[in-house]
Amino acid sequence: MQNNENKVALVSGANTGVGFQIAKALLENDYIVYVGSRDLQKGEAAVEQLGGSSKAIQLDITDSGSIHSAVEIVEKEYGYLTLLVNNAAISHAGTPGRTLEEIMGAQRASIAPVSELRKVWDTNVFGTLALTQAFLPLLHKAPSARIVTVSSALGSLTINANPQNPYRSNFDAVYGASKTALNGIFLSLAIDLENTGIKVHLVSPGFTATALNNFQGTDSVEEGSKEPIRVALAEDLPTGSFTGPADFSGEDNILPW
């Protein structure tokens, strides 16, 4: 166990995409970074690319045993956690190989299989909360700590309720609504922890070309990761913030709930 002068971060789903870019930026800013990946070999391959003080850690946020093992490793090696980045998510649980349009069409509230909602929400909502709750004791042991959860502007009720929003038809019952639920739970957590040394932030990336959308996003992973990286590195943001890219957000990148 080392002293708590080191900045120690864990990023879930960090072997690729936005999570990988966040891990890279944290390493460049003197963090020790645990690279969470369901497949440990993929995590180790990412660490080979990242170098520095990166460490691969097997982490399936839908598996309580995997979460418990990850907590034990961090506790044994450092005894605390400075930053938890909740990035792991899935966009669907249906037939692979479909286009983004096919996936979104099948996720409309009138026809979406409840089994698919359960599968996606198990990762995006319940798994994310389970991981966070498990690491709270180690976050409390840091002098100050932050939880940064990657959400989506697609989960904003205010944006989707606006008839002038050209993208409102993309708000679906599976992925989009999972981000709405995620926002609500983590705003509740921010309120719960507001008198502690732990800040809670939600952040939306751009429409990034990643495996989450079959690489059909309009932003490069580097461009789309800019706002999550900014939030992950910012230590002075007020707790309970929800920010995103400039095309949806207002002053100071603030998104409406």
Question: Residue ranges of each PLM-predicted region?
Answer:
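Hydrophobic positions on the long internal alpha-helix
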Residues: 85, 131-135, 139, 185-186, ...
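Conserved glycine-rich Rossmann-like NAD(P)H-binding loop of the short-chain dehydrogenase/reductase
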Residues: 29-45
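The beta1-alpha1 cofactor-binding region of Rossmann-like NAD(H)/NADP(H)-dependent oxidoreductases
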Residues: 40, 58-72
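Canonical Rossmann dinucleotide-binding motif of NAD(H)/NADP(H)-dependent dehydrogenases/reductases
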Residues: 2-34
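C-terminal helical subdomain
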Residues: 180, 195, 202-203, 210, ...
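A glycine-rich helix->loop->beta "capping" turn
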Residues: 52-55, 73-86, 92-97, 104-105, ...
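Catalytic loop of short-chain dehydrogenase/reductase
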Residues: 90-121, 140-194
